[in-house]
Amino acid sequence: SGQPVLRLEDVRRHIDQVDQKLLALLSERANLAHSVGEIKRAEGNEDAQFYRPEREAQVLRRIQSLNAGPLDDASVAWLFREIMSACLALEQPMRVAYLGPAGTFSQMAALRQFGHAAELVPCLSIAEVFRMVTSGSVSYGIAPVENSTEGGVSQTQEALLAHDLSICGEIALRIHHQLLSNASALGEVRRVYGHAQSLGQCRHWLDAHLPHAERVPVSSNGEGARLAAEAEDAVAIAPEVAAQLYQLQILAANIEDEAHNTTRFVVLGSQDAGASGADKTSLVVRSEERRVGKECRSRWA
């Protein structure tokens, strides 16, 4: 005889049962995470770091190695990142500085690393991100350090030299630039707002489609979207999420010149991270001679 025919109500009932089990397991995990905090406090270390990036990296690698599908590894990692973020928030609310305002790629990187339970603190500049971490106003900071098209981010490199902070992790984020505007056609555009790195990553597209528009560098792509929202003849280069935040339409999608455009972000902290088993060492080196063309920065990772 053939296989029994599944009925929709039976499948939904089974889903409800699985959801109930998931909820019970999530509660059990949260209680275990709380126990970890209690053990650390019992050891007499009131300043214990509840967030351990090396431990989180180990957990995510293990989960992905066990994943048999049908969810892909990226989806599974995202789910468990959010679970860990929510559990951590029960013990130690996390404040994370990033280059703001809302709607930047730095914000996206922060969410990918720390999840939605963390309190994200927007900063006006990369230098301010470093100052916030150094002063202890936030637990961690996120800063872009290198782009596959434009190379190193000089503001981050300079700040790494100026501050005694540790790199505790990294996030590689695929960068897709959208052209956002109140204008209805490219012919109406007179100004293009964007971070200097983003303007460079879209240089050839802008040359071909907006050759006469003024290119205006701004502190972040989120700030560019905010400025474009106040004008009728301006566009901003920004991520898709900024279109929703600032109520702009997408005039053109994925305008980056390189299809595999990727930016590497670093997680900044005041304490060294432990070994995770898949670690990198980063160095920033500057020569004593400061003449143009003589400054040298090298990183090995």
Where are these regions (language model features)?
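Domain-level signature for soluble enzymes in the chorismate/prephenate branch of the shikimate pathway
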Residues: 1-298
